[in-house]
A protein has these predicted regions:
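Histidine-acidic metal/acid-base catalytic patches
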Residues: 38, 90-110, 114-228
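Active-site acidic/histidine proton-transfer and metal-coordination neighborhood
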Residues: 5-107, 117, 198, 210-214, ...
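Structural preference for beta-strand elements that scaffold enzyme active sites
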Residues: 2-7, 40-43, 74-78, 105-109, ...
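Core segments of cupin and vicinal oxygen chelate
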Residues: 235, 241-281, 322, 330-334, ...
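N-terminal beta-strand motif that seeds the catalytic metal site of vicinal oxygen chelate
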Residues: 217-248, 303-306, 356
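Short, acidic/polar
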Residues: 19-33, 118-127, 166-169, 248, ...
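Vicinal oxygen chelate
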Residues: 158, 216-221, 226-230, 235-246, 276-286, 293-356
Length: 356
């Protein structure tokens, strides 16, 4: 386990004395902690201090001086433009400050939210040398018109789960030649109370899926990433399967009949029925063993399986498992055919069916 980034250090640049001197002293104390942790990179976010003075040259001078102190300690300084910064709220201004500071230990930290929430064209990142980008943080968010700080602190989500053009952001980043860490910075009220393992797996999935999308436009991206099939088109729902036992089976049969469904068949050797209304298929599974039996024991009458018609069942499962889904199999009975499947959310199963 490695601490790759120490954050945040707030309200550093643009302060008049004696606050300026105190800011440098604070930085030295943070450097002490970083050296104990074995961390060599600190994130300095653009100042929100009411006493901070504007000016690119003033900020660049502060960072040039800090770069000297950091270099003496074997530390690098990454400057990030907060979307709500007092004077600097745009990565283009942050880059100009870093450029004018002209110090090898001073670089840029890019956060997709801070750029995209202000609707800044991510292609402007392409003009930044990749070796001056020290760290990249990713977050998506739903398109909500609200205060930037509140939006950031409560509504961020995983890349690909919101409305921000995170793929375009990463395409621009990778076009610079950046080869450093890619991290997630997600502030979200639901995540704070969620399962850390589940959230971590979802985060890993989101990064792999995002970088796979980026790789198709930037072929040199991510040599260590798994080779994924392209996303497969879902044509429609093949079936919905319910696990039920005892009187609940009869109740479901009555309900389906009332809704206009008709029993279209029974399994030759299992307590399984197929009900149809046009192209809509519902399966009633009253088996006491296998997945349906386990689902009923855990939750009672429930949807235990969903079948989807897709362009390629094999490609769908291959992509899903590469993104962290767990493949599903169970023993086959006489005359039964294997159908590609994965475990879904909440203990359910998803089967994938194609023309093959």
């Amino acid at each position: 386990l490695q601490v790759m980034l120490f954050q945040p250090f707030r309200d550093f640049e643009g302060l008049p004395n004696p606050m300026r001197a105190k800011a440098f002293d604070r930085a030295e104390r943070k450097f002490d902690v970083m050296q104990e942790l074995g961390c060599d990179l600190i994130l300095m976010c653009s100042s929100c201090h009411p006493a901070a003075l504007g000016g690119i040259d003033r900020a660049a001078e502060d960072f040039a001086g800090l770069g000297e102190r950091a270099a003496a300690r074997g530390i690098r300084v990454g400057y990030e433009a907060l979307a709500w910064g007092r004077h600097v709220n745009d990565h283009r201004d942050a880059w100009e400050i870093v450029r004018r500071a002209d110090h090898p230990n001073v670089g840029l930290v890019l956060d997709s939210f801070h750029t995209l929430a202000r609707r800044i064209d991510p292609d402007s990142i392409r003009r930044i040398p990749g070796d001056k980008i020290f760290f990249v943080q990713l977050a998506d968010a739903p398109a909500i018109d609200m205060d930037l700080l509140y939006w950031s602190r409560h509504f961020r989500n995983m890349p690909g789960e919101g409305d921000l053009p995170v793929t375009a952001f990463m395409q621009a980043v990778m076009a610079t030649g950046y080869d450093g860490p890619i991290s997630l910075e997600i502030f979200n009220d639901q995540f704070r109370g969620g399962s850390p393992e589940t959230i971590a797996r979802d985060g890993h999935r989101s990064i792999v899926a995002l970088m796979d999308d980026v790789r198709h436009s930037e072929p040199d991206t991510g040599p260590g990433l798994p080779q994924l099939p392209r996303p497969v088109t879902v044509r429609d729902t093949a079936f919905i399967e319910f696990a039920a036992q005892g009187q609940e089976v009869s109740k479901l049969e009555t309900l389906l009949d009332t809704l206009g469904f008709r029993r279209a068949g029974r399994h030759k050797s299992k307590s399984v029925q197929l009900w149809r209304q046009g192209d809509v298929r519902v399966i009633l599974n009253a088996e006491t063993e296998g997945h349906a039996g386990s689902a009923w024991n855990a939750r009672g009458t429930t949807v235990c399986d969903i079948g989807l018609n897709v362009g390629s069942a094999l490609d769908t499962v291959t992509r899903a498992t590469a993104l962290g889904a767990k493949p599903f199999t169970q023993p086959l009975g006489p005359g039964e055919l294997p159908i590609p499947a994965i475990r879904g959310l909440g203990g359910s199963v998803m089967h994938f069916i194609d023309d093959g």
